[in-house]
A protein has these predicted regions:
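Catalytic pocket-lining loop regions of alpha/beta-barrel enzymes
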Residues: 1-101, 128
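Conserved, mostly hydrophobic/aromatic
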Residues: 5, 50, 71, 104, ...
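Generic hydrophobic, helix-prone segments enriched in Leu/Val/Ile
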Residues: 82-87, 110-117
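Mid-to-C-terminal alpha-helical segments outside catalytic/metal-binding sites
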Residues: 95-100, 112-152
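Glycine-rich, Trp-frequent "lid" loop and neighboring beta-strands that shape
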Residues: 107
């Protein structure tokens, strides 16, 4: 499958992270699985959904080290504390350009998603790092089709 996907320049979207289903197997939804695939198929474009919640730190590590691996930010504003930490880490590790906008529609509209992301950018606590407005601007406005080498 991955050989053909890479050869045909397909994009793989992984639903990474938690599931509310008691039957869901979390061992197969961890971001490090995508790292393994990326090492074996470095030309394969992959996207991890939801910043890999609850494994956002691992998601940042995977997108940092693998050229063709990205993450989407869908639903990250719904857990502002987790979204804040993930975006601060993305800034510190210079991988904000590898984060794609997503709303998790139909659960949330793009408008609600964008408003939620800017609310995270407004969070401040003492001298702690914060999510820059420019980071949210970049995520919301960048051309994902070009990043993923897709045409409209």
């Amino acid at each position: 499958f991955f050989i053909e996907a890479q050869k045909n320049e397909l994009v793989i979207l992984w639903h990474v992270g938690a599931t509310p289903s008691p039957h869901g197997d979390l061992s197969i939804s961890h971001p490090l699985i995508i790292d393994d695939v990326a090492r074996r198929f470095p030309g394969l474009t992959q996207i991890m959904a939801h910043l890999g919640h609850p494994w956002q730190r691992e998601t940042m590590a995977v997108i940092r080290k693998n050229r063709r691996v990205f993450a989407d930010i869908s639903a990250s504003w719904a857990r502002p504390f987790d979204g804040y930490h993930a975006l601060v880490r993305a800034q510190e590790w210079s991988v904000t350009n590898k984060i794609l906008f997503g709303s998790d529609f139909p659960l949330w509209t793009p408008k609600v998603a964008i408003e939620g992301l800017y609310e995270i950018a407004n969070l401040r606590s003492g001298n702690l790092p914060y999510v820059r407005k420019e980071t949210i601007d970049q995520i919301v406005n960048q051309d994902a089709l070009s990043m993923l080498r897709l045409s409209a």
